[in-house]
């Protein structure tokens, strides 16, 4: 994919900026594809990611811990857990160590919905990956690792 150098200079001042902008745009396009695919199983990407964390932990976790693992702020996680709870995918339980805190626990329906979403996400990601040659993939992986 060629860089879109027809964009106004407002977006970038040199090739490095153009590459960074192209990377962000590519990420948005992949995320949109994942979002569309997950809609078919009744999930958003945010819900799927939260369920992924909860399923992988296999124990109730605090909302602060969930926020940390999702790399977002606690208030966003509170709203996300509200939506997950309304859908019956997560339940809040009291934290035995801190009466002021609650933990999020994935429900059986949440596990089932996550299990339905995982192959959908995998298929989208595989489709994206197969568009890259093995050499392109190695170069891109090194470049993305450097950004972190």
What are these regions (language model features)?
Residues 20, 69, 103:
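Short aromatic/hydrophobic contact patches that present stacked aromatics
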Residues 1-41:
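N-terminal leader segment of winged-helix/HTH proteins
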Residues 24, 28, 32-73:
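N-terminal helix-turn-helix DNA-binding core of bacterial DNA-binding proteins
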Residues 5-6, 31, 62, 82-142:
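Charged, amphipathic alpha-helical coiled-coil/dimerization segments
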Residues 18, 49, 138:
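Active-site phosphate/pyrophosphate-handling residues
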Residues 144-148:
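A short beta-strand-loop micro-motif that forms or neighbors metal/cofactor-
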